[in-house]
Amino acid sequence: MLQNPIHLRLERLESWQHVTFMACLCERMYPNYAMFCKQTEFGDGQIYRRILDLIWETLTVKDAKVNFDSQLEKFEEAIPAADDYDLYGVYPAIDACVALSELMHSRLSGETLEHAIEVSKTSITTVAMLEMTQAGREMTDEELKTNPAVEQEWDIQWEIFRLLADCEERDIELIKGLRTDLREAGEGNIGINFQQ
């Protein structure tokens, strides 16, 4: 779908920067999952929050150990099936789950670049699909590139990227600041507000 130069630039970042980038985007997708769980009483919306908190912990606490195999297993049961719901909200919720799964797989494999690119694409796809659904039609990549909501999502991804790219080494305060800012904003990538 939508390509962006950010996907090439991510190659310049180190593993911890990729993981932080992915965690930031998952933080912005969390409200989509939490709201879906609340509306449908599906599963435990807090499992996403708990796993994401563990990922932040691995970024900020020296020698933090997490069994991501076990977390991934638990999480797979918390992913809704699109066919079970006649509700648009299931799609952004699934996208949020795909992104968090990518992030966990990156922690298991140690391969962070390709997963960071996938999380970026997943987040932008969530935004683009909502825009097309609201418009009631498919849009070309050219139309989507100039769509204000899509532009805003790219701008936020670039802003996170720049903050991370400016770091010479792992900056715990920056990581904590990003987490706090995104959590306090409480707004998802498609405008859902969900304060925890």
List each model region and its residues.
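Structured binding/interaction patches within domain cores
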Residues: L2, R12-E153
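C-terminal auxiliary extensions adjacent to catalytic cores
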Residues: I124-Q196
